[in-house]
Amino acid sequence: MSRPIEIANVSSGNRRTLPALHGSSFSSRSELDNNTNSKISRRLRELVCQRMGENPLRLRQSFHETISNDSYGNSEKLVIRPCICCNSVLRYPAQAMCFRCSLCMTVNDVYFCLSGSQIKTKASTDGSQFISVEHFVETIHQTRSALQLAKQRTGNVQAIVAAGLPLRELISLVFGSPPILNKLFSVKNGCSIQSSGLNYKLIYQLYHDITNLDILITNELLRAIESLLRRPMLYCHDPADYQYLLILLENPLLNSKSKNIVNKSSSILKRILGVLSNLNEKTHHFFISCFKKQPYNNPKFFRRKVDLINKFIGQRLMETYSRNKRKHYYNNDWQIKSAAITMALLYSANSQMRLIDRSSFYCIMADFINLYHDFELWEQKINCFCFCQYPFLLSMGAKISILQLDARRKMEIKAREAFFSSILSKMNVEPYLMIRVRRDRLLEDSLRQINDRNKDFRKALKVEFLGEEGIDAGGLKREWLLLLTRKVFSPEFGLFVNCEESSNYLWFNYSHRSKEIDYYHMSGILMGIAIHNSINLDVQMPRAFYKKLLQLPLSFNDLDDFQPSLYRGLKELLLFEGDVKNTYGLNFTINLKAVEGFRTVELKEGGSELSVDNENRKEYVLRYVDYLLNTTVKKQFSAFFDGFMKVCGGNAISLFQDNEISKLIRGSEEVIDWELLKNVCVYDFYDQNAISNSISESEPSMTASKYLCHSFVSKRKIILWFWDLISHYSLKMQKLFLIFVTGSDRIPATGAHNFQLRISVLGPDSDQLPISHTCFNHLCIWEYSSREKLKKKLDTALLETNGFNIR
């Protein structure tokens, strides 16, 4: 093998001294200056190449750019190429056969300069030494017996070392060569629709046998794998040549918690992910197909791989933060970027197979970074890693935080603009989006003001109910949006209709009138205002709606929750094994409801004359679904989308997936966990000092707090009665309670643990009704004398109160 040359790392700025290939000296100062200018010019050229020439998907490129002179004044030509592990842009002498990256210390072999036939010859030569499975298994058995004898008879360290020597040599040979690894664990039939071409049963067996023998053998396995990955020797002529990465990824030591193994296994994993992430696009597609086959098509197996890489990202974030003490420390970390790209491959496979929930890809440690700084870097297209490039890694809470921060920034900008406009024009310019409505004319007043083109809907929302004394600090706008959307999105209003009698979902009305287009535009603005102001709506829309909102392509499966009976019928048509033409008697037309009766529509030109048969039934189904979900509602959705983007236009909304945008708009669908809500609730009492004095002195932090947590008030009768009463309420009454206290009947999209309720006991027994401050999720009650009295007062408050007043 050629000895590697130490190479300057152009992208990171790290440099190792490269000895002059030809001696040179400068005869004059002008010659030195000219050479210096030349070096600066080339350096700028390299930086431009680095910034503009990289693949935006971070896929490996084998670009081969020659430079006339290096930056050391030598006339030797240099070549620029990315490292196969960390993707740093490197330069090396054109005649070199290998070079070492100064960042990740990986030796890169320059095989891409060989022809295809030369590469195949070299690959077959390197893998010519065949190791049979039987020989490997027999060596393991012999070593196990030899180790037992050595430990029983002598216990001598040298004897134990000698007993394991044959197996250690075999491990070094097998796990030090990609071709041998691929040959050893390949199945006879190779890749197929069901199999990735590897014998995973054999892989598990050999790993188990090797790692349960002796620590010296385990260490040799780790050493051989790390040595291989420090010089991968890639041949790049067939994606299947990289299957050895899947074999190495099955090493159980990667999940080890032993202190002696963790550092080595982490080093191995980062190199596996590094090489895998920097392969070319064709090979990435090959790995995605492997991730859809056995054993990856087992949800538990797939989940373990996702958890392994997520754990690696989390640990890396903690390690680098502890060294840098900066919240944007990870942006140039190649290990995190490599792990994220590998996760993208797994995510792509999961999107097609739906093996595990998409929330399984969330990296919880990413919630603790400076999310808005990450978002700004992504928006500015700075050439560095950002989590926003891989939004499936960000949790729902992280995305909501980014959206809220972005909305707050826009609101502040609008308020500042209003302030300066007031000064310059000497006129009062409203810094808020003010909506003033009469409760008995809610729909009429609201739509009139939303239709006002002079209003800026990106300002912070403030609502005033005329004739009421409520001051909007959050609660009034929540109730206004809740009441208004229930009317606008109800089937009685006419803009949206029920998809099917058996479905609760709403869809755009096919038989719209031209004058209703403006109403669709206003309903889009209304939904945008809700998201912009972090308010949940009571709107039942199918998955297809949210995918269209994010401009994602629709598929046949999106019809499932939209029109389930139609979906089942079309699926039966696709799976029917008999004669479709004579059995179904269909043609390329469909019947749709109109204002008066039904109307027949051709799915393609001449569709009424074209029968559906076994050959074209798939085309019929796709055209049917496309017409139903896209063509029939094109004008309605276009108006709705324009209104929505008028408020929510921007990059933050694109971070969400369709299931997440549904939660963002509607709130959490989960059943309310009142036990969890009780545990995060805080309290304050009219006799709080008495309670505080009863708390042990060993817990001074709680006595100093303004509010008390549940554990310190749980024995008070009024608290026991209250939670017992709430837990026994019907679902309808529980929703009324949420509306009474918060102004909305839903908990936040991130769940009950992020929803804090505050309960104040205002005084001793009283005949007054409970009071709520919806702006602050605050309930005020009195210490009623009995459970029955508490129930009577609370029921009255929930069922009979309406409107906002100041007491």
UniProtKB/Swiss-Prot annotation:
Q: Entry's InterPro entries?
A: E3A/B/C-like, HECT_dom, Hect_E3_ubiquitin_ligase, Znf_UBP
Q: What is its EC number?
A: 2.3.2.26
Q: Domain HECT: where?
A: 453-807
Predominant location category: cytoplasm
Q: Which reaction does it catalyse?
A: S-ubiquitinyl-[E2 ubiquitin-conjugating enzyme]-L-cysteine + [acceptor protein]-L-lysine = [E2 ubiquitin-conjugating enzyme]-L-cysteine + N(6)-ubiquitinyl-[acceptor protein]-L-lysine
Q: Name one GO cellular component term.
A: cytoplasm
Q: In which pathway does it act?
A: Protein modification; protein ubiquitination
Disulfide bridge map: none
Question: What does the entry give for GO biological process?
Answer: meiotic cell cycle; protein polyubiquitination
Q: Which UniProt keywords apply?
A: Cytoplasm, Cytoskeleton, Meiosis, Transferase, Ubl conjugation pathway
| Active site: residue positions | 775
Give a short account of what the protein does. Probable E3 ubiquitin-protein ligase. Has a role in meiosis.
UniProt-recorded name of the protein: Probable E3 ubiquitin-protein ligase mug30
Taxonomic source organism: Schizosaccharomyces pombe (strain 972 / ATCC 24843)
